Amino acid sequence: LETIESEWEKYQKTNQQNSLTAAAIDNLVKIDREDRLLTLVNLIDPNQNNALTLEQLQQLAKHLQTVAQQRGEADLWQIATGINLGLNTWSNLSNDLTSWLYEQNRNLGFTNDNERVAPWQIWASKVNPSWLKRVLESLANQQAFDSITQDLTLADWVETAIVFQYIQRGLINFFDQRIYSEKLGAKLSISTFLTFALIWSLLTNSFEQVSKNSLYSRGCFQMALQILRTFAQRDYFPLYGGIFASFSGSYLKEALDYLSIPLRYVEGTGEKARILTLIAYSNRIRGDYPQARECHQQALEIARQQQDSACEIANLNHLSRLNAIQKNYTEAINLSQRALILSRQQGNSLGQANALANLGYSQVQEAQQLERYDPEIYQSSIEYLKQGLKLAESLQDWQSKSLCCSSLGLAYLVLERTQDAINILLQGLESAKYYGDVYLQGLLLTYLGEAYYQDKNFEQAIYMGSLGMYWLHEIGAVEWRQAASLLTVIRGKNIAAFEQTFSLERSSLIKSIGLEGYQYISEILSKYQQGN
């Protein structure tokens, strides 16, 4: 009986796989030719209940080749060829998927710099000459994709889609095992999700703007959305972080339409709200405040409908921060108070820490705006900020700690407590570095530049301001202009002294951002002074 049962289960499984493969072939053959690529992308979407497995993809490629020969359809043959190439390439790469993680005395990451080792060149060396190899080499050399998006076949694109998907999924599975620690595993998984989503977003833009190939552009965009959709289901999804990618116009509409498909929610969470939160945060950092506000408002409404209190609190906090940036401090205070009350009711310590940081910061700024100089007002605000900082430290939440430190440091600067500001901002900078938040690092470096300027330590002001401006400019954050303004003021007081100090800081700056980064600082400053 056990043998019969085992054979029956095996038969059912095989029959189901054959049925799925047959259905996939039927879909690809019958659908309009211009829709075949997107249909394939949908068939390999891991968010689907019946996403094709490696074995089923092999069967699909085999049958597609037969159908393509019978019907004389080149695009079906190209798709089949791309699937086979992708499976073979993945087979060659899979053994080296994680070898780059074991480089000694190097930090982990996906960018090549003095402190990190990235996997792109290692993987490129394992790949035969192909369009995929050129993509990997572009990533290794940190080059734009514009020069390679005009010369590829359908098979090239399909191979890349399959290989990148299995690389990303393999790394996520590896990191999610928490082989190092829970926090480090989550951090590496987050980095992987965002890196591959960003790669597909960059390819989307290159195909759209350079090669004018809307088919490949739409395919890349769908791959990015699939990654974000999977990411939104993870318990470590960063409600207080962003991807620094721009979604606008028809692509934003397509994102909303795609994510409106009925989804399996995790603990009542609306994935669409979480992805919108991520996109909105990114838009705020880039300075697109209207788009950020619109996305946060939509995310807030959906989160309430789905009873996702963590997402609701996060968007209240983000909207508070956005209003504070736009100097609408009364509304910022109101939103942060609502976030604080709700987070305390729900026992959401992370939301509470962020709400306290926003509340204290907004109160200090409003008092300055209204020219109120009552010490009790400032002391009350600083107490909120200290509570938030203490809470973030107890959670070992380095991102929230760096946010609290930045707000507290600014409050001290307003009160001209310069040394207190420097001390707390340095703490925040260390936390931001540990967490790997480039935006907060750039912001804290800029604030430190202003603090040292207030302290008349112009050497440190130039050093910190230069680093802050560089990192913020690198990620497209609008606050780079704040750092550039500081450096311009210092330079305006004594050009010769500024240039001499900048030269003296050369070795320290090169150690942090490399020779090209050091040289680029002057270009960024010149760009600001020319009004660009």
Residue ranges of predicted features:
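Structural signature of alpha-solenoid helical repeat junctions
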Residues: E271, C311, G351, I377-S380, ...
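Alpha-solenoid helical-repeat scaffolds
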Residues: T160-L335, A339-L342
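Short coil/turn linkers that connect adjacent helices within long alpha-helical scaffolds
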Residues: Y265-E267, I302-D308, R344-N348, K390-D397, ...
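TPR/TPR-like alpha-solenoid signature
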Residues: G270, T277, N317, A357, ...
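Tetratricopeptide repeat
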Residues: A255-L259, A292, H296-A299, L319, ...
